[in-house]
């Protein structure tokens, strides 16, 4: 149809045909759809395109992305941009602040009296307790005191082994190395002792303090130092000191080796910044502490009724987060702070790596946290400014037309095999929208915080990834593990064999199977763990939000009253989310599946298509 129609356009010229563009600005992508209307009112879809959204959704920098997408779509039908007669923009309902998602936990800053560590290749096995002694002071050691020797990387493994063998009269029970040379030293020792290596900040190790080290046998993990009472036994701690050492013990669970050093206990100071309370200003004024967890927070949100605004307790982690969102949104929208309101949040339980202060090698332990996505509304809608800017740049009329969810449901109706009443779920990067379109034309819509970006953030947080891009890729692609140069094990347990050898750099690594290439995950995380975190993050965000959004728009708030649901938006393209939703909605007897907009576009382009369809409905514009 595309090529035929483009010839048609050139032949008839612009006099009889009107070219209209529908533009959907999303949190992550900007999609456009071009259609033509003849004098006889006949309508034809011509082309579509999508580009990455430039700037925060609903702000002036979006114009660049819109122009780029329009140029691409017009280029596909061989027409210049100037030939457009009308541009219709979506009413980009509330904007989501980029910083609106973060995990909130209680921060405890303590001058730790313990240090834990976990290198990958220790040597020897067993546990040892003794006073720390630097290798350069080995000649000052006394024969009746048990020692743990400490050697910096200035000493080669041969020197370290020679010194240990030379001073056999000393009671040396363990060894801590800065270099990654535990096995090399062990092979040269006359007497076998547990050895822990790769202690980066060895200069911070306090000499003559008591320390315990433990190395587990291959394939097992340590038992004494990952247990607070085990540490108490080895280092002779009292009840209060044992309580203070619990985070260290927790951080060492599952490790192959560890060091715990007892530093002077007079300097433990705790400075707690509480997680804080959330205040809901709705039909009812309600408050809840973050520590109650995501389920109770979401129940309280529901009990509060229609929300006018949400904020947090001053000088707490959640209070600081909400005020930061409002300030950054006010800057973007050029509004006053009090004109910015948070109208919805999605809270999700997660685990966040918390750094243990005083750690020798940047150890962290996983603490319970709550991830929050917030929906932000500004008093005036910045979309009008975008329309004005586009008019200036393109010399073409631009109008803001129609609420996103309504447009998406109009677009979804072009999916073959659908009929009214129809429910749609538009799952994008920042928000999940739902709408129910009744046979008599009535529409009910809702717009909720939390979608693809929150999933990415949860994956990044729980796996402790440095790069957000890696988290985004883990969300999008299935996993595999390269087990030889000619085969890999897929995440479902199946094997895939290759006739050509795989790049040796991937050997032994977990990889992501992107179209046409493998992407190596640099972090050393087991495939099963990545799989579990990815699925759990999608389930927590998408399945929970979908049910919440559909219940909001369902007749009588009863899910069984919805016969069928069409999934649209970027996240509906995901390789597992639609199946997860099908399973979750099956118990309500709802037919649910990915949309196929206009029979060609898949789940994308629904809003842009709806903007064109709604134009035909009220073609007095332009």
Which stretches of residues belong to each language-model region?
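A short acidic Gly-Thr/Ser loop motif
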Residues: 23-29, 90-92, 179, 424-432, ...
């Amino acid at each position: 149809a595309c090529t035929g129609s483009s010839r048609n356009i050139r032949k008839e010229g612009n006099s009889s045909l009107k070219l209209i563009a529908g533009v959907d600005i999303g949190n992550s992508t900007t999609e456009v759809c071009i259609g033509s209307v003849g004098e006889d009112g006949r309508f034809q879809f011509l082309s579509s395109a999508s580009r990455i959204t430039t700037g925060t959704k609903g702000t002036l920098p979006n114009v660049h992305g819109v122009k780029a997408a329009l140029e691409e779509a017009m280029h596909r039908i061989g027409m210049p941009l100037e030939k457009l007669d009308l541009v219709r923009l979506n009413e980009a309902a509330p904007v989501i602040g980029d910083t609106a998602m973060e995990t909130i936990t209680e921060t405890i800053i303590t001058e730790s009296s313990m240090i834990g560590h976990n290198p990958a290749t220790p040597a020897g096995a067993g546990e040892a307790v003794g006073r720390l002694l630097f290798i350069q002071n080995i000649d000052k050691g006394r024969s009746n005191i048990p020692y743990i020797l400490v050697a910096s990387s200035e000493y080669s493994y041969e020197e370290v082994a020679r010194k240990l063998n030379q001073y056999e009269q000393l009671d040396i029970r363990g060894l801590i190395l800065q270099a990654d040379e535990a096995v090399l030293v062990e092979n040269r020792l006359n007497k076998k002792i547990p050895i822990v290596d790769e202690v980066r900040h060895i200069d911070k190790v306090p000499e003559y303090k008591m320390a315990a080290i433990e190395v587990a046998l291959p394939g097992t993990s340590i038992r004494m130092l990952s247990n607070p009472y085990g540490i108490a036994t080895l280092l002779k701690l009292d009840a209060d000191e044992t309580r203070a050492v619990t985070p260290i013990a927790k951080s060492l669970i599952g490790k192959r080796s560890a060091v715990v050093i007892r530093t002077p206990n007079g300097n433990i100071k705790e400075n707690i910044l509480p997680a804080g309370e959330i205040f809901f200003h709705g039909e009812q004024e309600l408050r809840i502490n973050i520590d109650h967890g995501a389920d109770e927070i979401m129940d309280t949100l529901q009990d509060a009724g229609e929300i006018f605004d949400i904020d947090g307790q001053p000088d707490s982690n959640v209070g600081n987060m909400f005020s930061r969102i409002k300030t950054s949104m006010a800057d973007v929208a050029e509004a006053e702070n009090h004109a910015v309101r948070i109208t919805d949040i999605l809270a999700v339980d997660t685990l966040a790596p918390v750094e243990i202060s005083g750690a020798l090698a940047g150890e962290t332990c996983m603490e319970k946290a709550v991830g929050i996505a917030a929906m932000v509304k500004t008093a005036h809608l910045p979309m009008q400014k975008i329309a004005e800017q586009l008019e200036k740049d393109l010399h073409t009329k631009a109008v803001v037309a129609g609420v996103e969810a309504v447009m998406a449901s109009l677009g979804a109706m072009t999916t073959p095999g659908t009929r009214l009443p129809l429910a749609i779920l538009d799952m994008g990067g920042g928000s999940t929208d739902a709408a129910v379109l009744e046979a008599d034309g009535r529409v009910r819509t809702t717009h909720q915080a939390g979608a693809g970006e929150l999933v990415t953030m949860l994956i990044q947080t729980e796996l402790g990834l440095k790069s957000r891009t890696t988290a985004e890729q883990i969300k999008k692609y299935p996993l595999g593990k390269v087990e030889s140069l000619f085969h890999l094990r897929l995440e479902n347990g199946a094997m895939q064999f290759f006739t050509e050898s795989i790049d040796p750099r991937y050997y032994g690594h977990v990889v992501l199977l992107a179209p046409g290439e493998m992407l190596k995950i640099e972090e050393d995380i087991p495939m099963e763990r990545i799989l579990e975190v990815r699925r759990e993050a999608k389930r927590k965000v998408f399945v929970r939000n979908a049910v919440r959004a559909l219940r909001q728009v369902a007749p009588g708030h009863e899910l069984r009253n919805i016969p069928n649901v069409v999934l649209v938006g970027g996240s509906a393209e995901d390789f597992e989310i639609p199946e997860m939703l099908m399973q979750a909605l099956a118990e309500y007897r709802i037919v649910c599946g990915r949309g196929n907009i206009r029979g060609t576009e898949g789940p994308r382009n629904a809003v842009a298509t709806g903007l064109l369809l709604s134009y035909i409905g009220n073609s007095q514009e332009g």
